[in-house]
Amino acid sequence: MHEEDFELTFDLEPLEPAPQPKAAAPAVPVPRAAASQPRPPAEPPTPAPVKTAAQPHPVPPARPAAQEAARPAVSVRETEKPRPAPAAHTAAPARGVLISGGDRGIGAAAARAFYEAGYRVAVLYHTNAQAAAALEASLPGCIALQCDVASRAACESAFTAAEIMLGHVDVLVCNAGIAQQKLFTDITPAEWQHMLDVNLTGAFHLCQLALPGMIRRKWGRILTVSSMWGQTGGSCEVHYSAAKAGLIGLTKALAREEGPSGITVNCVAPGVIDTDMMAAFTPGDKAALAEETPVGRLGNAQEVARALLFLAGEEAGYITGQEIGRAHV
C-alpha cells in the first residue's frame, strides 16, 4: 500500500516534465542544471538527468580542467622562458672561449677552430710573444694575453682582462703544459714542483676563476688537455705522467660537483701529436711511435682541436667527466 502511494507521488511529479522544455531549450545551461538537479529524484526517469547525475564530477571538472590546462600552458612557457636564457649562450657568436697555452701547437689549433666556429677567442701565452702576435694578426679580434699559469696572481690578472674583453668566459680550455724526459732518480724537487705547477695547478687556478661566472649563468664548458701518459704512465716522464693523471682526476671530480649548475667538464688525452713539443724526437723516433699507434701515424693538432670544439658544443651537453684518448685521439 505504501509503495502504491509512492507511485502516486511519482505520477504527480510528471508535472515537472513541463519544465523539461526549459531544460531542453537552454541546451548550454544543461551542465548547470545537472549540477543543481541531481538532488531531486524526479529526474532519474529522464535519461539526460541520469547521465548528468553520473557525470556531476566529470562535467564540472571538465571546464576547470580545460582552464587549468590552459593555465599550465602559460606557466610551462613561463618556466621554459628562463631556460632559454642560458640557451642564449648556445649561439656560438655569443660565447667567449679562453685557451691557455694558445700560442702554439694544440692551443693555437684550438684557437683557430673556435674562431672559425664564431666564438670570441682569447689565448694565454707565457713567453712566445712573437707567436702570440702572429696568431692575433691571423685571427682579427683574437686577444693574446701574457700569463704564467703557475702564478695565481698572473692568472687572476689575465683572466680579468680576458673577461672584460670577451664579455664573459663560457668555455675554458686548460691546455698550457710543459714536458721533460728524465730518469725519475734524476728529477730534482724543483723540476717536480714546476711540472705540477704548470700542468696541474695552472688548471686549478683558471677553473676557480672561471667557475663563478659559469655558475651564475648556469652554463659552462671546462676542457682539460691531458695526455695518454696520464692514463698509462710514461717511462722517463714520471713527473709529467703524474701531473697529467692529476688533471684527469680533477676533470672527473669537478664534473660531478658542477654538473647541477649546467657545467660540463671533460678531458682530451691525446696520444702522440706532431707539435713543436716533439722537436727533440728524431724521424726514427717518430716512426717508431707511429708504428705503436693503431692508425699507424702520428696525430695532428687540428684533430685534437676538433675534439675540443665538439665537447664545447650543445651536441655534447650530456657528456661530462669523460676522457677522450687512451692510445690516440
Task: List where the protein language model places each region.
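Short, small/polar-rich loop/turn modules that mediate ligand/substrate recognition or access, typified
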Residues: 259, 264, 319-321
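Conserved glycine-rich cofactor-binding loop
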Residues: 103-104
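Alpha-helical segment proximal to the catalytic Tyr-Lys
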Residues: 212, 256-257, 317
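Residue(s) in the substrate-gating loop at a strand-loop-helix junction
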Residues: 227
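Substrate-binding pocket helix/loop in short-chain dehydrogenase/reductase
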Residues: 183-184, 191-196, 278, 289
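Active-site helix of classical SDR
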Residues: 207, 243, 251
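Conserved glycine-rich Rossmann-like NAD(P)H-binding loop of the short-chain dehydrogenase/reductase
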Residues: 117-133
